[in-house]
């Protein structure tokens, strides 16, 4: 899988094709993070074939739909449990991100894993993503933003006034 652009969250439901032996096969549902619905269905069959004796050739996709965030304007903390196949073996990881949506947090996770561990998207398996409360956060990089009296430094900027002369005898004041 190529994690191109921002990933989207899909709910994919699939099952084995009904047969004489098994007329009502059980449905399997997964949350898949993928750039589009084609990749989402492909990842679903990849994971299902690892977990159950199912293949796309003798199965069917019942539903594949986009999952929309309930509150996309509220900043939330997300815990991401993932499995990474690195050059030295398979590693389980827990990472925390702060973002507006679940899919944005997972996209951030893919970028972070690529930057810190040189992990390619195909070798990262997202196992669970959960919104976590502020008191349950473990990582100091996320906990630093849980201060109600948080202050950020003002940028040291030069204001370019449109009608002021370009050359003047006075130095610009950049402290506000």
From Swiss-Prot:
Short name of one Pfam family: Ribosomal_L18A
Known function: Component of the large ribosomal subunit. The ribosome is a large ribonucleoprotein complex responsible for the synthesis of proteins in the cell.
Protein's name in the database: Large ribosomal subunit protein eL20
Gene Ontology terms describing biological process: translation
Cellular compartment(s): Cytoplasm
Family statement: Belongs to the eukaryotic ribosomal protein eL20 family.
Molecular function in Gene Ontology: structural constituent of ribosome
Entry keywords, A to Z: Cytoplasm, Ribonucleoprotein, Ribosomal protein
SUPFAM superfamilies xref list: RplX-like
Cellular component per GO, a single term: ribosome
Quaternary structure (record): Component of the large ribosomal subunit.
InterPro entries for the chain: Ribosomal_eL20, Ribosomal_eL20_dom, Ribosomal_eL20_eukaryotes
HAMAP family (UniProt xref): Ribosomal_eL20
């Amino acid at each position: 899988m190529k994690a191109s652009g921002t990933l989207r969250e899909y709910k994919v439901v699939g099952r084995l094709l009904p047969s004489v032996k098994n007329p009502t096969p059980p449905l399997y549902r997964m949350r898949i993070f993928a750039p589009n619905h084609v990749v989402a269905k492909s990842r679903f069959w990849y994971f299902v074939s690892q977990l159950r004796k199912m293949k796309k050739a003798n199965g069917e996709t019942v539903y594949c739909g986009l999952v929309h965030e309930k509150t996309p304007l509220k900043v939330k903390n997300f815990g991401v449990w993932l499995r990474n196949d690195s050059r030295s073996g398979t590693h389980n990881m827990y990472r925390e991100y702060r973002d507006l949506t679940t899919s944005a947090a997972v996209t951030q996770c893919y970028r972070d894993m690529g930057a810190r561990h040189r992990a390619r998207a195909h070798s990262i398996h997202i196992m669970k993503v959960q919104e976590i409360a502020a008191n349950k956060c473990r990582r100091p990089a996320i906990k630093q933003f849980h201060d109600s009296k948080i202050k950020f430094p003002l940028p040291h900027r030069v204001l370019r006034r449109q009608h002021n002369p370009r050359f003047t005898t006075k130095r610009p004041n950049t402290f506000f």
